[in-house]
From Swiss-Prot:
ATP-binding in keyword set: no
One GO cellular component, as annotated: cytoplasm
Name assigned to this protein: BTB/POZ domain and ankyrin repeat-containing protein NPR1
ANK repeat windows: 229-258, 269-299, 301-328, 332-361
Residue span of region Salicylic acid-binding core (SBC): 391-526
Low complexity bias: start-end ranges: 564-574
Annotated signal peptide: none
Amino-acid positions noted as binding Zn(2+) in the UniProt annotation, renumbered to this chain: 150, 155, 157, 160
Biased composition (Polar residues): 1-18
Domain BTB: 55-140
């Protein structure tokens, strides 16, 4: 006979077993319920077309989705998930005395949301989408390949610029919105890949970690130590980082004996004077400083400095002095072309190549200029479709230019069959060149502008191709009438023809794809009017396509001219997510 206690023990054992099973089932049910809640809330953000009527705010992202975009959001969800956003919405509601907006609610500019840091870190459309998606769903989705992968087929996409920049943008947005768990997650991810990050990209991470401050102290300390021990020069650091961080780097390098107390790692005063002259866009002052004989352009690494920090016009003027070795290396082993590949400015790259820069030269770690450019370019920018007549992305254009330069097979000979057929007819040659370049400006605006700037077309007199009509007053002094009879070649005609011819030659050399398209149009034996009446379906389609492109370009130019006069060119292009300091 079993003791009485055995029955009690068995009863408790059976009860415990049942409760464990029930507890497991309850846990599974809870997980499933949370998953459904996550999916349902995420759908409100991921499917704006279905939930637009519920959205009561929108966040405007400059440059998002290719040309700027708004993300529809719901203030109640964001306020519940982010203390920072709750404060933003509360202040705006109080200021508006409880009034609401119409047609999707109030509109918030992302840069205003990010405060002062938004001027230094450009948080992209996809990075903000990931942060907002996390606020809705509580889960981190897959990183978007178009924004996180570079176009170098040999890259592991762990520490390349697109991957690092994307994580840094998410980290900064999450920290600003006070989303602690997402901030910690992306801080850990960056810490895990720091050893694989190229030294130039460390500045980007250091800048973001410094802005995040206390929420990213581990990342800040480790990144700061790596920059201190790196071969990054003080000029580059000074242009990229705030003064308080520069002081920490100088103090650390002094304590480690990496720099001398006399110059603290900065170049001597003669070199600094040349750099300041370049910052002032004063190449004539640079020439005067060189006559003092204290230094030269190569010792001052003036071309490197101009390419990295100055307007493209200054680089061109400096090259025209013909006083610097265009293939000179800086202490880190970078040629001027390597720096230009990081800058990603097509005009600068073409200017260097036309002056003899060697695209096959490699850095100390074995990278050519084209590979540097590829490691900086996002797949979304490179493989994205560009609408005809719209500017090509600069990143893609730089890669195409460098690849073409490596092939060393520019198309030779006349611009096309039509120009060769013009023979000795100077008027015909001028008309051809003017028409070809004008068509290139419409169909391939970015490529045409690069070639025209280097050929200095803007410094010549534009031909009046009209039928005797007087040009507008503002253009009378900048046009030359080709309809004069008899036509006599003048000095201004020759200058214009030389510049236009060089434009076409540069197009042949660096933009063969575009040149082939122009060849097919310009070499058509039939004029456009008869082409429009042609019964051939293919030719009629080609005519109408061309007509649409020209008409669209005309209307866009007219609208732009109505809005404003001349547009000024931008000065310096930032590398990555961090805006350069001046």
């Amino acid at each position: 006979m079993e003791p009485p206690t055995s029955h009690v023990t068995n009863a408790f054992s059976d009860s415990d077993s049942a409760s464990v099973e029930e507890g497991g089932a309850d846990a599974d049910a809870d997980v499933e319920a949370l998953r459904r809640l996550s999916d349902n809330l995420a759908a409100a953000f991921r499917s704006p077309e279905d939930f637009a009527f519920l959205a009561d705010a929108r966040i405007a992202v400059p440059g998002g989705g290719g040309g700027g975009g708004d993300l529809l959001v719901h203030r109640c969800v964001l306020s519940a998930r982010s203390p920072f956003l709750r404060g933003v919405f509360a202040r705006r509601a109080a200021a508006a005395a409880g009034g609401g907006g119409e047609d999707g609610g109030e509109r918030l500019e992302l840069r205003e949301l990010l405060g002062g840091g938004g001027e230094e870190v450009e948080v992209g459309y996809e990075a903000l989408r990931l942060v907002l998606d996390y606020l809705y769903s509580g889960r981190v989705g897959d990183l978007p390949k178009a924004a996180c992968l570079c176009v170098d087929e040999d890259c592991a996409h762990v520490g390349c610029h697109p991957a690092v920049a994307f994580m840094a943008q998410v980290l900064f947005a999450a920290s600003t919105f006070q989303v602690a768990e997402l901030t910690n997650l992306f801080q850990r991810r960056l810490l895990d890949v720091l050893d694989k990050v190229e030294v130039d990209n460390l500045l980007l991470i250091l800048s973001v970690a410094n802005l995040c401050n206390k929420s990213c102290m581990k990342l800040l300390e480790r990144c700061l130590d790596m920059v201190v021990r790196s071969n990054l020069d003080m000029i580059t650091l000074e242009k990229s980082l705030p003064p308080d961080v520069i002081k920490q780097i100088i103090d650390a390098r002094l304590s480690l004996g990496l720099i001398s107390p006399e110059n603290k790692g900065f170049p001597n005063k003669h070199v600094r004077r040349i750099h300041r002259a370049l910052d002032s866009d004063d190449v004539e002052l640079v020439r005067m400083l060189l006559t003092e004989g204290q230094t030269n352009l190569d010792d001052a690494f003036a071309l490197h400095y101009a390419v990295e920090h100055c307007d493209s016009k200054i680089t061109t003027e400096l090259l025209d002095l013909a006083l610097a070795d265009v293939n000179h290396r800086n202490p880190r082993g970078y040629t001027v072309l390597h720096i230009a590949a990081r800058r990603r400015e097509p005009k600068i790259i073409v200017s260097l190549l036309t002056k003899g820069a060697r695209p096959a030269d490699v850095t100390f770690d074995g990278r050519k200029a084209v590979q540097i450019s590829k490691r900086l370019t996002k797949q979304g920018d490179y493989f994205g479709v560009t609408e005809e007549g719209k500017p090509s992305p600069k990143d893609r254009l730089c890669i195409e230019i460098l690849e073409q330069a490596e092939r060393r097979d520019p198309q030779l000979g006349e611009a096309s069959v039509s120009l060769a057929m013009a023979g000795e007819s100077l008027r015909g040659r001028l008309l051809y060149l003017e028409n070809r370049v004008a068509l290139a400006r419409i169909m391939f605006p970015m490529e045409a502008r690069v070639a025209m700037d280097i050929a200095q077309v803007d410094g010549t007199l534009e031909f009046n191709l009209g039928s005797g009509a007087n040009p507008p007053p503002e253009r009378q002094r900048t046009t030359v009438d080709l309809n004069e009879s008899p036509f006599i070649m003048k000095e201004e005609h020759l200058a214009r023809m030389t510049a236009l011819s060089k434009t076409v030659e540069l197009g042949k050399r660096f933009f063969p794809r575009c040149s082939n398209v122009l060849d097919k149009i310009m070499d058509d034996e039939t004029d456009p009017v008869s082409l429009g009446r042609d019964t051939s379906a293919e030719k009629r389609k080609r005519f109408h396509d061309l007509q649409d492109v020209l008409q669209k370009a005309f209307h866009e130019d007219k609208e732009e001219n109505d809005r404003s006069g001349l547009s000024s060119s931008s000065s310096s292009t930032s590398i990555g997510a961090i805006r350069p300091r001046r």
